[in-house]
Each structure stands twice: as C-alpha cells, then as structure tokens.
Amino acid sequence: MKSVGTWLLATSLLAMTGVCADERDVRMFAHWAGDHETRAFRQMLVDARLYGVVPIHQLLRSASDWRLCRASPFAVAPTAQWPAVRSTLALIRTLDEQGILRRFEVVSAYRDPKLNACAGGAVGSAHTRAFAVDLLLPDWADPNPLCVFWQQHGQAWNMGLGRYPSGRIHLDTAGYRTWGGDGSAGSSFCARPS
C-alpha cells in the first residue's frame, strides 16, 4: 500500500509541475550529452543570465519526429544562431515574469534543415535559420494572454507566434507574424476580429 501512495504522490507532483509530453527526459539527455559537446552553449546561457529559463534537456530537443527521421533526439544550435537563442529566451523569461507563460514544456527547438524537412517543417523555418521553440501548455492553461502580449508588444520583440492543430504553440523572435492551423495569419488564434 505504501508503494501505491508513493506512486500517487509522485504522479501528483509531476502533474503540478506542468506538462510532461515527451519521452526525451533528463535521463535521455544526460546519456546524449555524454557524447556531445554542450559546454560552450551552456556557458553562453550562463553568461547571458538565461540558463534555466527553459530546462536544458527541453531547450536542446530537436524535432518530435526525430525517431521517424532517424535523427538525434537533441541538437545544439550553431553558434551563428546563438544571438537568436538569447532573444527568444529573453522573450520567454519576460512572458514568465509577466505571468503569461508560467507552465509549459518545450517539445522542439533547433532543427537542422534535413530533420526539419523530414518532420514536415516549413521551408525556411525559424527552427533552422534562427531559433524557435514549440511548446505545450497544460490543458488548464489559457493561451489568450499570449495573443494579448503579441498584439501589444510583439512587434517590438520581432515575435512570431503560431498555434498548430495539435495545440502546440510556436514562439520565436525571427519576425513579427502570427498564424494558425492552416499556416495563414487569418487562421491565427490571435487574429483580431474584423
């Protein structure tokens, strides 16, 4: 009976901490990181005071279709894209500080062009040329404050905000735009009513 109680407590604690939608967890990341260089990237985050804005094992997740595409589950963005990493993480930190984006899980970030194509990503995707994150919110979370922020401050941040039919939300700082399920601005959950 004690093990059932412990299991229920652990499950409850996991549920309270946010979303857990991806098998690429801390253990899988630690195994991967043992064979891949991440020190310079981590140091860049520390120097920019952005380390921990997103857990590193989530921040380095490649496409969710990594298995299907026979790619790596994690990837470090090229150094030329690190300024975009910093700006996107600064945006996420601001959204957190304003109470707009408190609980979330990053399920996809940098992707190399080959993996992006295999995973069905857009040609010229911010995931490949700048830095973007796709994230999931808990079922109870209201995504509309993201739209209000985008409408009021998105242009200043050069913020891209999209939502896919799966419920995933895309964030980047690679251009002021929004889109929805069909890829157009008109289908965006942030489109202002006419």
Describe the residue ranges of each PLM region:
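Positively charged n-region of N-terminal signal peptides that target proteins for export
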Residues: 1-4
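Bacterial N-terminal signal peptides
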Residues: 7-15
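Extracytoplasmic cell-surface/polysaccharide-interacting catalytic and binding patches
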Residues: 17-89, 188-194
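Catalytic cores and adjacent binding grooves of peptidoglycan-active enzymes
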Residues: 20-25, 40, 124-194
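Sec/Tat-exported extracytoplasmic proteins
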Residues: 48, 92-99, 139, 154
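Stable alpha-helical elements in mature extracytoplasmic
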Residues: 84-91, 100, 142-149
